[in-house]
């Protein structure tokens, strides 16, 4: 019985670590409370060489999004990062290095990752951001401590496109549209031609279904003004 209970507890903790929607360790924002048809487009892991195409499309459709950027990639593509800001999109912190070992880092190392990314954002973009998205959506007590120490708002999602895992564009598109509802926060990545092609079709869908969009900045501002 003890072994069973321990196993169940361990499974729950592991599941809670990898499913940001459960809010097991961190009370992340995963959806906007709203009665109207509006959603948020969020892009992780940029800026990259693909980001300008995404920006061109968003500009053409007059849509604002939120980009959760990696510090070292901001350093690699400073002009692209500055363009994201100049075109009115929201910015979030996605750590400096997006380490594959994120779930195993100490709280002090996580604080360092977040603060170093903040420094790059400030230096190159001349802005500050209160938003943070955990790499891979992984949360645990150390990450929770780091978020509290750095005074960030953790932003998750309720529609995960799996665009870095699924190769078929149609399957990604169907996965998003099937799970979409009022206030959804969609997780995408501005890192491939594949996701760009999905975005083209997704924006047409949003237009047909009369969805508007919101950014993390506009969501927080509207909440503060309620």
Segments predicted by a language model, with ranges:
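Catalytic-site microenvironment of enzymes
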Residues: 54, 205-208, 226
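His/Asp/Glu-enriched short active-site or ligand-binding loop at hydrolase and phosphoryl-transfer sites
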Residues: 138-140, 144-179, 211-223
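Active-site beta->alpha N-cap acidic-glycine motif
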Residues: 13-102, 113-116, 120-123, 127-129, ...
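A cross-domain feature marking catalytic cores of carbohydrate-active enzymes
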Residues: 43-45, 69-71, 93-95, 134-136, ...
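Catalytic grooves of carbohydrate-active enzymes
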Residues: 180-219
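Hydrophobic membrane-insertion alpha-helices, especially the h-region
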Residues: 1-12
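CE4/NodB-like, metal-dependent polysaccharide N-deacetylase domain
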Residues: 56-59, 63-68, 89-90, 107-138, ...
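Acidic-and-aromatic substrate-binding clefts and catalytic sites of carbohydrate-active enzymes
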Residues: 46-49, 69-77, 101-108, 133-139, ...
């Amino acid at each position: 019985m003890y072994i069973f209970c321990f196993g169940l507890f361990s499974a729950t903790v592991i599941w809670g670590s990898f499913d940001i929607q459960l809010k097991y360790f961190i009370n992340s924002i995963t959806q906007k409370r709203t009665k109207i048809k509006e959603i948020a487009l969020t892009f992780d892991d940029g800026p990259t060489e693909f980001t300008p195409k995404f920006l061109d499309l968003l500009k053409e459709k007059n849509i604002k999004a939120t980009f959760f950027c990696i510090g070292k990639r901001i350093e690699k593509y400073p002009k692209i990062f500055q363009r994201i800001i100049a075109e009115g999109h929201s910015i979030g912190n996605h750590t400096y290095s997006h380490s594959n070992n994120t779930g195993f880092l100490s709280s002090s190392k996580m604080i360092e990752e977040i603060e170093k990314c903040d420094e790059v954002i400030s230096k190159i973009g001349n802005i500050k951001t209160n938003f943070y998205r955990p790499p891979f959506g992984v949360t645990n007590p150390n990450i929770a401590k780091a978020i509290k120490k750095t005074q960030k708002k953790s932003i998750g999602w309720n529609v995960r496109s799996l665009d870095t895992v699924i190769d078929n564009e149609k399957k990604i598109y169907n996965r998003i549209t099937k799970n979409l509802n009022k206030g959804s926060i969609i997780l995408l990545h501005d890192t491939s031609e594949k996701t760009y092609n999905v975005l083209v079709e997704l924006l047409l869908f949003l237009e047909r279904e009369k969805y508007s969009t919101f950014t993390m900045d506009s969501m927080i501002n509207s909440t503060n003004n309620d």
